[in-house]
UniProtKB/Swiss-Prot annotation:
InterPro entries: DNA_pol3_alpha_NTPase_dom, DNA_pol3_finger, DNA_PolC-like_N_II, DNA_PolC-type_N_I, DnaE2/DnaE/PolC, DNAPol_HHH, DnaQ, Exonuclease_RNaseT/DNA_pol3. Residues 613-1437 are annotated as: dNTP polymerization site. This is DNA polymerase III PolC-type. Pfam families: DNA_pol3_a_NI, DNA_pol3_a_NII, DNA_pol3_alpha, DNA_pol3_finger, HHH_6, PHP, RNase_T, tRNA_anti-codon.
Length: 1437
């Protein structure tokens, strides 16, 4: 029996070492044990013999064996076998293990392996039935391979299973197969002979292997290469090639090496498996890396494990990567001035680092970054440019809007109610006033509220109409065949309108066509008539409407619109709409035509303007700061669907910026498509340079019929270059880059597709916007002639780049706030508090420590950080909430004396609160002052206070005391918002911001996008192709957010725009806080970040204080009954069988998890310092598992002696006699996992540091600070005190603050019901949902509470709180928000309604309490509404 417990304990230790102690695993490992461990020293191999109660699910088995192999790979090669007590075998579990069984087999011919891989066996009794093609195969399987398969299954824990075979193919097929295989084998034999001769020759010449990677045999250059999209089914011996985007090498239990990698040739992707045939292969496989291009030769098979077609490769050869070159001569390379990174939200996919690297490889001197409306890639761009030695131009593609769109044109002082109006509409062949023509012009004259005349005419365009125009307007070619020419129609219309006021819906369009026709056809000036645009007038009068389209407005005002998009019907409807609008305008005091534009730029006018794209490039540091200001304005004050920059603001902050005309969504290109040359010239004069892009980039405009044909498109581009010449503005050719290579476009397509109709880019085929070489760009613009192409592609882009300075968007130094007198205040506060504790004549150890710390703190300008932290903590303490410290701030005595932390870092000591007598223990004999025995003052008889944790200051600010202090504070979660707002009081609202974060597309989300895209387009994708596409879509910006506790402080001698733009988190313009636009990590070293975190522990402590009246600071830290819960359950009055736990620490912070509870079982701590050790051990990496755990288990040392926290190392080594500076150095190296140098080991040995201690140091990877551990344990001990001595108060606080998921129905029923639900959840294992796992923790505490003699009542309509569990005798009344589906707001509504008066009926409760029918039924079903009638009763008296 004792041996059994040892075996199980060893297995539990092993599980901790391989990190498999989660509840999801432990369900299967409950009765597991290590029966034997066989060790072969010569071969460095270990074999574990496990025993389990039942067969492990394959997923669990696979995880166990993988972690075993990985965990001990540096020590030995690990294998294992399993013995099962109750092996219940099903066909499904046999099939789950099948692929692993086949992988592990050795010495089986490839055809048989292929045959077995293509199927899963059937189970009949104890027989595995597989299908074969021939008698020979069947005989081989039964006679030769059956025992091998049986042995493999036995290793997994299965009973003996016999293999049987059924034949299902003809002998003819087999013969054909044999002949084919014979031919292949002969060819491979010949090739093997050639390779052997080649190797022998190389060996004779004593040449070292070099050159590209070759695994297996060389693949000939002339061998046919199959594209991956052509592979549709299983095939024998084909060759493919592609880019390796994922690779994994693993050693199988059999000793063979398996290499699994995925390649793509951008037509598709495939997973390739290759088994090493010899040691040389295995070594070479490790050289196969992601990013290589390879050829692979092998067979295509259906893999039952991955359920997909895969290649089983025999040969893999590295080949030269396919890359594009920029062959333009040095000095004649282009500069890309329009480029997007993944910070262009859900639109661009290639990281800025890769784009910069490519530009450098091509020999480009500079590159510009111009993300959509943001500058969040600037920090990464700066790093990449510095790394690759290339000039970075920092810019942005802005959404430019006019401050207000005119309602009236050609303003005239004419009384609106007396005027005659011509309401007109044109139908056209397209949208371009320059390249398209009018096909219908209709108008009505309105005077005195009535239509007095009509004009209607078709015009012959002398070219066929497009299908789109016919569908949109209902006008056909036949209807226009006999119509007059446009010139005649325009002439007649001009005469008919006279000088009346013209009215149109979206007048800029109609007037554009009219004015071009006037000039082009009649050769007269554009119309001088006053104009009213009913679209803009509608936006001004009815801003609450979602849109202001003609049909929308007509529907709103019950105006009949018979046939929309036919001119005559549109004009009549617009006429009646005008009459309504003029009446509403008059009510706003608008009487004259020239008053219509008076409100143009006011209020939300920026929302009514359509945004145009414009490129902004920062020329110098002034420009950079102005760019930051514009980004901030666009996100804070002018955000409407997208961040917008009003033209007036751009003019205001234009200094230091170059403004480019951007893409087809810029106003210059659109103007050249649709407006007269004079108008475009006027528009272009605003810009510093004009942009044109390759015709391919504008291809969607042809699809959308915005441009008639390729010829018209090239004419527009040519006209922009001519306009640049005329205005003496450089015209530059840009690529509008969204990804690196053309094959990357699929990633962008998937991201845009995921946004559905919300993204207008989904309405057309996406253009090709890869990063183009100089040659590609020159070719794209060759239609302009060689000289002009070179000018816009090379000369002008270099010219613009030369205008830009080298700019640093990120600063080098830290800029902390300044508070007058901070140094003196911290010094005075420290000494005042020290003297109040230790007396006017401070003990030398105290004064020396204070002076040492103040020298560093004040000397390096850190006093202000201490003072700020002090003010924040003091405010919280004054408001009744304790604050817990995190990190190593408790290493600073000054932090203790200024009340930033409760942790006292001095050596353990007594101090008298009455006469200040003190006694210090600075020899290392005591771990914590809290562990000293109680003692009275020898001078005055007062009980002495015990304190001190012996933590060196160096662990906080470094040995020289010059490390920037990182003070993290745990405030109560419910007090955190007040602490945040207090920083506004301390520094001013314009000097504090929440630390910004950027949320990118995660792997799971990308997987959803890829699957959605495949489904929408009826694509069947192989798993490898899905993986490739997922990789390409991850990391793209999806949203922004804020750090949960980080507050960035800008000193008052700087402003935020010196460091970062600002915005609202997730562009939520109603947010209380603004955030930094940059991710806070980017400016972490430039500005002070206060970590004001929200934590449950202070909230629990506050609730317990309120319930009990006990000041938590008076709670003893060495209460014997409290200490017992860390060893057992005795002080709770229950047995471990009752609560299913061997300790009493369920629900105690830091000590309630299964992993730490196991540590407690192993170590049985009895003191505060040992609890601190356990906290340090549990948070470190390789500090407990395989290290301290073994030292304690093997009785080499006690818990108190092992290395638990990083500070222990420095303190211990100083006590042993090492120089403090060396002790500090060793601590820093060890805590970062860097081990020890031979010199340090020698010095440690010279000072009698034991060998086990030195070995322990060498194993550690990461260590926890002792101050952090001490702060956590202090909170834990205080909460544990209530659990032991005030149980119901503890449970009320726990369930109120910490628990989120309840099953109140079960909890009310008591222990038996709770256990049953817990067993159900445990039985689900890995399949249990996150909600169920959270509920399990709550139920553990509920069970413990019930077993201690307490109970839960049902929710009470008149006594339940909204959110808190209420104590009633020996039971708890649950709050309303514990009811399933009832949130906190709904719970508060019920309580509010209850306070207003008693509920008369269920109907009254539902109405006043805003309770849903489901919640009402729940309350009724559980007897909470017994006294209430269904409906209100009317009384006659």
């Amino acid at each position: 029996m004792e041996q059994l417990s040892v075996n199980r304990r060893q297995f539990q230790i092993l599980l901790q070492q391989i990190n498999m102690t989660d509840d999801t695993f432990m369900t299967y490992f409950e009765h597991g044990e290590i029966k034997k461990l066989t060790i072969h020293k010569a071969s460095k191999s270990w074999h574990f013999h496990f025993q389990f109660k039942s067969l492990l699910p394959f997923q669990i088995y696979d995880t166990l064996t993988t972690r075993l192999t990985q965990s001990f790979a540096h020590i030995a090669k690990v294998t294992s076998s399993i013995e099962v007590q109750d092996a219940e075998v099903s066909e499904s579990i046999v099939q789950d293990y099948w692929s692993r069984c086949i992988e592990e087999l050795q010495g089986i011919s490839p055809p048989i392996i292929s045959l077995l891989n293509q199927q899963k066996p059937k189970l009949k009794g104890n027989k595995l039935i597989v299908k074969t093609k021939t008698d020979t195969e069947a005989a081989a399987l039964k006679n030769k391979y059956s025992s091998m398969i049986q042995a493999e299954y036995r290793q997994f824990g299965f009973p003996d299973l016999q293999l049987d075979a059924e034949i299902f193919v003809s002998e003819q097929e087999v013969q054909k197969f044999r002949e084919q295989k014979l031919a292949e084998d002969q060819e491979r034999a010949m090739q093997a002979l050639i390779e052997m001769e080649k190797k022998d020759k190389e060996s004779d010449e004593d040449q070292a292997p070099s050159g590209p990677l070759v695994i297996g045999y060389q693949i000939k250059d002339n061998e046919e290469i199959r594209t991956l999209d052509s592979i549709m089914d299983e095939e024998r011996r084909i060759t493919v090639q592609g880019y390796v985007f994922d690779v994994e090498t693993r050693e199988l239990k059999s000793g063979r090496t398996l290499c699994i990698f995925k390649i793509t040739d951008y037509t598709n992707s495939i997973l390739i498996k290759m088994f090493a045939r010899e040691k040389e292969d295995a070594a070479l496989m490790k050289s196969l890396k992601k990013g290589m291009w390879v050829k692979a030769r092998g067979s295509i098979q259906n893999d039952t494990f991955v359920r997909d077609l895969v290649m089983i490769a025999n040969d893999v050869n590295e080949i030269k990567a396919k890359t594009r070159e920029d062959s333009a001569p040095e000095g004649e390379k282009r500069v890309e001035l329009h480029l997007h990174s993944p910070m262009s939200q859900m639109d661009a996919v290639t990281g800025i680092g890769k784009l910069v690297e490519q530009a450098k490889k091509w020999g480009h001197e500079a590159i510009a970054l111009t993300d959509h409306a943001v500058v969040q890639s600037f920090p990464d761009a700066y790093s990449a440019a510095k790394k690759h030695g290339i000039k970075m131009i920092y810019g942005m593609e802005a959404n430019l809007v006019d401050d207000g769109v005119p309602i009236a044109y050609n303003a005239a002082h004419r009384l609106l109610e007396e005027e005659t109006y011509v309401v007109f509409d044109v139908e056209t062949t397209g949208l371009s006033a320059v390249y398209d023509t009018i096909i219908e012009l209709a108008a009505v004259k309105v005077k005195g509220g009535e239509i007095i005349d009509k004009f209607e005419a078709f015009a012959n365009p002398h070219r066929p109409l497009s299908a789109t125009i016919i569908e949109l307007t209902g006008i056909t070619d036949d209807m226009l065949q006999d119509a007059p020419d446009v010139v005649d129609v325009i002439r007649d219309f001009r005469e008919w309108i006279g000088d009346d006021i013209l009215v149109a819906h979206n007048a800029s369009f109609d007037m554009g066509f009219l004015n071009v026709a006037y000039k082009k056809l009649l050769e007269v000036e554009k119309a001088k008539n006053p104009v009213i645009d009913t679209l803009e007038l509608g936006r001004f009068l009815y801003p609450e409407f979602k849109n202001h389209r003609l049909n929308t407005l007509c529907k709103k005002f019950d105006i009949e619109l018979t046939q929309h998009h036919r001119a005559i019907y549109d004009t009549e409807a617009t006429a009646y709409l005008l009459l309504k609008m003029l009446k509403d305008a008059a009510e706003k005091g608008i009487q004259y035509h020239d008053e219509l534009n008076e409100n143009m730029g006011q209020s939300n006018a920026y929302q009514r303007s359509r945004p145009y794209h414009a490129t902004l490039l920062a020329v110098n540091s002034t420009g950079l700061k102005n760019l930051f200001k514009l980004v901030s304005l666009s996100h804070i004050h002018y955000f409407y669907r997208v961040p917008r920059i009003p033209r007036s603001q751009l003019e205001k902050y234009r200094e230091g910026l170059l403004i480019g005309s951007a893409c087809d969504r810029g106003e210059v290109f659109e103007g050249m498509m649709q407006k007269s040359p004079e108008e475009v010239e006027d528009i272009a004069s605003f810009y510093d340079y004009l942009e044109v892009q390759p015709p391919e980039v504008y291809r969607h405009l042809l699809e959308l019929e915005l441009v008639r044909d390729e010829k018209a498109l090239k004419e527009i581009i040519a006209n922009i270059t001519k306009l640049g010449e005329k205005l003496n503005k450089p015209v530059v050719a840009t690529g509008n880059v969204h990804y690196l290579n053309d094959e990357d476009k699929i990633y962008r397509k998937i991201l845009i597709s995921s946004q559905g109709g919300a993204n207008p880019l989904n309405r057309h085929e996406l253009p090709k916007v890869h990063f183009r070489t100089t040659d590609e760009m020159l070719e794209a613009f060759s239609f302009l002639g060689e000289e002009k192409a070179k000018e816009i592609v090379v000369t002008n882009t270099q010219k613009v780049a030369s205008l830009v300075d080298d700019i640093k968007p990120i600063k080098d130094d830290l800029y902390t706030p300044k508070i007058e007198g901070a140094d003196e205040e911290i010094r005075e506060m420290s000494y005042q508090r020290a003297r109040s504790i230790y007396g006017e004549e401070l003990p030398e150890i105290v004064e020396a420590r204070i002076e040492k710390e103040l020298k560093s703190i004040i000397g390096h300008g850190f006093a202000v950080i201490y003072l700020i932290s002090h003010k924040l903590v003091k405010r919280s303490l004054d408001d009744g909430y304790l604050v817990g410290s995190r990190g190593s701030v408790g290493s600073s005595l000054v932090a203790t004396l200024t009340e930033i932390t409760e942790v006292n870092p001095l050596p353990p000591h007594y101090v008298c609160p009455e006469c200040q007598h003190s006694e210090f223990f600075n020899d290392g004999s005591v771990g914590s002052g809290f562990d000293l025995p109680d003692k009275t003052c020898p001078h005055c008889g007062t009980p002495l206070k015990k304190d001190g944790h012996d933590i060196p200051f160096e662990t906080f600010l470094g040995f020289k005391g010059d490390k920037v202090p990182d003070i993290d504070l745990n405030f109560s979660g419910e007090y955190q918002p007040q602490a945040h707002n207090y920083t506004k009081v301390l520094f001013g609202e314009d000097n504090v911001y929440r630390a910004g974060t950027i949320g990118t597309v995660a792997e799971k989300t990308a997987y959803g996008y890829v699957k959605g895209y495949a489904g929408d387009n009826n694509l069947h994708m192989r798993g490898a192709e899905i993986d490739r596409l997922v990789q390409g879509c991850t990391g793209v910006k999806r949203t922004t957010g804020q750090h949960p506790g980080g507050i960035i402080v800008v000193p008052d001698y700087m402003d935020i725009y010196d460091f970062s733009p600002i915005q609202f988190p997730a562009d939520a313009t109603g947010s209380e806080w603004k955030t930094t636009h940059f991710d806070f990590h980017s400016i972490h070293d430039n500005l002070l970040k206060l970590d004001i975190l929200g934590h449950d522990d202070p909230t629990v402590i506050r609730m317990l204080q309120d319930l009990s009246g006990i000041d938590p600071k008076t709670i003893p830290t060495d209460d014997p009954e409290v200490m017992k819960i860390f060893q057992g359950t005795e002080s709770l009055g229950v047995t471990e069988e009752q609560i299913g736990c061997k300790t009493g620490t369920l629900g105690i912070p830091e000590f309630g998890t299964r992993f730490v509870r196991q540590m407690l079982e192993d170590t049985k701590p009895t003191t505060f310092s040992e609890l601190v050790q356990i906290s340090g051990l549990s948070h470190g990496t390789d500090v407990w598992l395989g290290n301290a755990q073994e030292l304690i288990h093997n009785n080499i040392c006690e818990l108190s002696e092992v290395i638990g926290c990083r500070d222990d190392i420095m303190v211990y080594l100083i006590y042993q006699g090492l120089e403090p500076s060396l002790a500090f150095k060793i601590m820093e190296f060890v805590r970062k996992g860097k081990g020890l140098t031979p010199e340090w080991e020698e010095e440690m040995k010279n000072n009698n540091v034991p060998d086990w201690y030195i070995d322990s140091c060498k194993k550690i990877k990461y260590m926890f600070p002792k101050a952090h551990a001490a702060a956590y344990v202090l909170m834990a001990v205080r909460i544990a005190y209530f659990k032991v001595h005030h149980a119901l108060l503890y449970y009320a606080a726990y369930f109120t603050v910490r628990a989120d998921d309840f099953d109140i129905d079960t909890m009310i029923k008591g222990s038996t019901a709770i256990r049953a639900v817990m067993e159900d959840i445990n039985a689900k294992g890995l399949d249990a949902s996150p909600k169920e796992k959270n509920l399990l923790t709550v139920l553990e505490l509920a069970l413990e509470m019930c077993e201690r003699g307490y109970s839960f009542q049902k929710v009470d309509l008149y006594r339940s709180s909204a959110t808190e569990f209420i104590i009633d005798g020996n039971s708890l009344i649950p709050p309303f928000n514990s009811i399933p589906g009832l949130g906190t707001n709904a719970a508060l509504n019920i309580v509010k309604a209850r306070e207003e008066g008693e509920f008369l009926s269920k109907e009254d409760l539902q109405k006043r309490g805003k309770v849903s029918k489901t919640i009402l039924e729940y309350l009724d079903r559980h007897g909470c509404l017994e006294s209430l009638p269904d409906q209100n009763q009317l009384s006659l008296f």
